[in-house]
Regions:
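Short, surface-exposed loop/turn motifs with a glycine/proline- and acidic-biased composition
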Residues: 455, 526-552
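Catalytic domains of carbohydrate-active enzymes, especially glycoside hydrolases
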Residues: 63-92, 192-195
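Polysaccharide-binding and catalytic clefts of secreted carbohydrate-active enzymes
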Residues: 80-81, 88, 131, 153-278, ...
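Active-site-adjacent "subsite" loops/lids of carbohydrate-active enzymes
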Residues: 34-37, 43-65, 136-188, 192
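C-terminal tail/sorting-segment detector
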Residues: 482-485, 543-566
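Substrate-binding cleft of secreted/luminal carbohydrate-active enzymes
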Residues: 276-277, 281-299, 316-387
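Beta-strand-rich modules
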Residues: 450-471
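Pro/Thr/Ser/Gly-rich low-complexity, intrinsically disordered linker/stalk tracts
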Residues: 374-416, 470-487
Length: 566
């Protein structure tokens, strides 16, 4: 039997051939998944990605905002759904913090706030949510900037004993003050902003730090424990404030040496005390974005290792998109295509490092991203204590379609969820399990005006609610324009009893099942109904599918659909 690593390597190197590449070019048209994290790191350090204009006047603030809008519009066109925004840069922030100073990337001056009530972080959060994108606050954990930076000097004033290396100043992970301090910063962000995640970067011992002495308090295990304690403090703070906020980090791309593949003495666990797979197992992380900026056997075996040790959490492969630039590595585009394709084959999302190399369309990477992500996708859902998400309901006109003319169609609904997904299809009921039927993901309103191409005849619509944990409700299907064939498959009910077709009753099923359109069984009904009806008391409003299991049959038979609207 082939190992997962062997299969991955076979997939990767097969895709080098021209024939396999032709197949891969068509891949997005029929394999774009409904749930997948598609992310980009948006770097504010040294103004690398954004902003390019300092917010020193009303006009410049508007330019800074427009730069951000342009980037987000490019992401949206490529169906990217997650933005990792560098929020704590180097012991300095891009928001008004009560703990640390302003980073100079916003106004050009350390410690100087922008005027005119402008809050860059709030602006990015709002603009991301307008586009249905998740926004994660990227926190650079250990770096404190240069020795003379304002952030580093303020840390010294607070009693931190920084370590100074050739690359700058760093917090000491062994310092007992560090876990609570970083937790306070993350708590401040989560408490004051509607972010969807906290993303920890450089949550490890820095490069260039002396090796463990082996004496008490400074062994490899001690160092791993110190980093894990920092992660735990941040996790506990964040989840206590908003349990739906996703915890993630960007670990070194190789966790440890593998049986047949060496990390070449540079890995997270043994070299830098970063036990990220253990954080998944303990529930301290919801996602990992390993920085896999490698090729060939330095990439694919380690990708498989991340997937095999994800402990029912989520892995998002960090792609070294910057290597497409001749000044950085001069990779060929096919290398990145292969990595993205193989990651998707394995059910793994992808994240581009970093934004400028994607949006500048190096070697056509943005064009490929748009093809690869043929349809919108939802992020992976978190587990929550809430059993079901309340479905949306009709407005007073008892239908989704409020008005339509030759140019537009207006949909409207009611509900209590923060976001909604809109689906469209030529078949009824709309199958919400198919990514190609999704028109909008995580739409924040309750009314939508559609223009071309969704105003043609014979297009049907459905709405689902999505909660803060990214769990989805059953669908609210439109009622006004179902075809005759669709009506014939609809089963009559009054919200209490469901009427079965007489011919179905005669076949004497062993039992019936009621399923959501996602295929989840929500109720099993007796195969010996009273007359030709069965009870459906207590089913929430929405569209359902009825199936029957007959004697001597291995598979359930579709009976029809019914709609509950109490």
């Amino acid at each position: 039997m082939y190992s997962k690593i062997s299969i991955l390597l076979l997939l990767a190197f097969m895709s080098i051939s021209s024939m396999a590449q032709t197949v891969r070019n068509n891949y997005p048209n029929f394999q774009s998944p409904k749930r997948e994290t598609r992310a980009v790191w948006l770097t504010t350090f040294a103004n690398l990605d954004w902003p390019k204009t300092y917010a020193t006047s009303p006009e410049n603030i508007e330019r800074q905002k427009q730069e951000l809008i342009t980037l987000l519009d490019q992401y949206q066109q490529a169906n990217i759904n997650t933005v990792l925004l560098q929020t704590r840069v180097r012991a300095a922030t891009i928001y008004p913090s009560a703990i640390e100073p302003w980073d100079k990337c916003i106004t050009g001056t350390e410690g100087k706030a922008p005027s005119y009530g402008y809050d860059p972080l709030k602006f990015v959060v709002d603009e991301c949510h307008k586009r249905g994108m998740a926004i994660h606050a990227w926190i650079a954990s250990m770096p404190a900037g240069s020795k003379r930076s304002l952030g580093a000097r303020m840390l010294v004033q607070k009693g931190f004993k920084l370590r100074y290396l050739s690359t700058g100043a760093y917090l000491n992970p062994a310092d007992s003050q560090v876990p609570n301090y970083l937790a306070q910063i993350c708590g401040e962000v989560v408490r004051n902003y509607d972010v969807d995640g906290i993303h920890l970067d450089y949550i490890r011992y820095p490069d260039g730090w002396s090796s463990p002495t082996g004496r008490y308090g400074d062994t490899r295990d001690d160092r791993r424990t110190q980093i894990t304690n920092i992660v735990r403090a941040i996790h506990d703070q964040v989840k206590a404030i908003k349990p739906w906020v996703k915890m993630s980090c960007s670990p070194i791309g190789k966790y440890a040496d593998l049986n047949h593949y060496s990390s070449k003495n540079y890995n997270g666990r043994d070299r830098l005390s970063q036990e990220s797979q253990e954080w998944l197992r303990q529930g301290l992380m919801d996602q990992l974005y390993p920085m896999q900026y490698f090729r060939g056997t330095n990439y694919y075996p380690f990708l498989a290792d991340w997937e095999e040790n994800k402990h029912a959490k989520e892995i998002v492969s960090g792609i070294g998109t910057y290597f497409l630039d001749p000044r950085e590595g001069n990779w060929k585009l096919n290398e990145v295509k292969r990595q993205m394709n193989v990651s998707r084959d394995l059910g793994i999302g992808h994240a581009h490092f970093r934004s400028a190399f994607l949006t500048n369309n190096k070697q056509g990477i943005l064009d490929f991203e748009q093809q690869f992500n043929a349809y919108p996708a939802l992020p992976q859902a978190l587990e929550s204590k809430q059993q079901t998400v309340a479905a949306p309901s009709y407005c007073k006109d008892n239908d989704l379609i409020m008005s339509e003319d030759s140019n537009t169609k207006q949909l409207a609904w009611e509900g209590i969820s923060p976001y909604y997904n809109i689906y469209a299809s030529k078949t009824f009921p709309v199958d919400i399990t198919k990514a190609e039927n999704m028109v909008y993901a995580k739409f924040s309103g309750k009314m939508l005006t559609l223009k071309n191409p969704y105003q043609q005849h014979n297009i049907h619509y459905a709405i689902t609610a999505i909660d803060r944990f990214d769990n989805e409700s059953i669908a609210l299907q439109e009622r006004s324009r179902t075809t005759a064939s669709a009506h014939s498959a609809m089963l009559s009910n009054d919200g209490i009893t469901l009427e079965l077709p007489c011919k179905m009753v005669a076949f004497k099923a062993r039992y019936y099942t009621v399923e959501t359109l996602q295929g989840n069984i929500v109720r099993q009904l007796s195969g010996t109904p009273k007359g030709n009806t069965v009870s459906i008391i207590g089913l929430p409003n929405g569209m359902y599918k009825l199936k029957a299991m007959y004697p001597h049959s291995k598979f359930a038979s579709n009976i029809g659909f019914f709609f509950v609207n109490n």
